[in-house]
């Protein structure tokens, strides 16, 4: 993976071990896309902020994720795939944007911590460290690796 070159060992090996695990083990894989040509050239909101179409797709993914969880179905968002690879394998037209590649499947239980947090990849940030009130502060959250 191209992005693995940016990571030093021993984290690189851990990163590469995540790559295909969910894709191969899940019951179903879903590629969620956004087609900016749908609904015509004028869509309220999208003319002033073009990204709102993609934001709406992300909200739909979140809603699907929450609905799946209530049914005992786990969802994993695979973010270490190349969009170009997805386009080629799934024959996605150039104007359509792959937004999410999801792995879904029944799970025995939901863990109390996300897998990446459990494995030490990244810690969970405190809510107070990522919410700003009234203005953007200069201090960025401290991420400990």
Language model feature labels by segment:
Residues 27-29, 75, 97-101:
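Structural motif
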Residues 101-145:
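C-terminal helix-cap and adjacent tail motif
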């Amino acid at each position: 993976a191209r992005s693995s070159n940016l990571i030093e060992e021993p984290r690189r090996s851990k990163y590469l071990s995540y790559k295909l695990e969910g894709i191969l083990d899940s019951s179903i894989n879903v590629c969620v896309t956004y087609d900016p040509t749908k609904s015509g050239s004028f869509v309220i909101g999208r003319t002033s902020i073009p990204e709102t179409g993609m934001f709406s797709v992300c909200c739909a993914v979140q809603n699907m994720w929450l609905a799946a969880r209530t049914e005992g179905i786990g969802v994993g968002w695979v973010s270490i795939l190349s969009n170009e690879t997805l386009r080629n394998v799934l024959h996605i037209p150039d104007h359509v944007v792959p937004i999410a590649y999801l792995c879904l499947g029944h799970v025995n239980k939901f863990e109390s911590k996300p897998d990446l947090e459990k494995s030490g990849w990244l810690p969970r940030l405190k809510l107070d460290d990522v919410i700003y009130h009234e203005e953007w502060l200069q201090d960025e959250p401290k991420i400990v690796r």
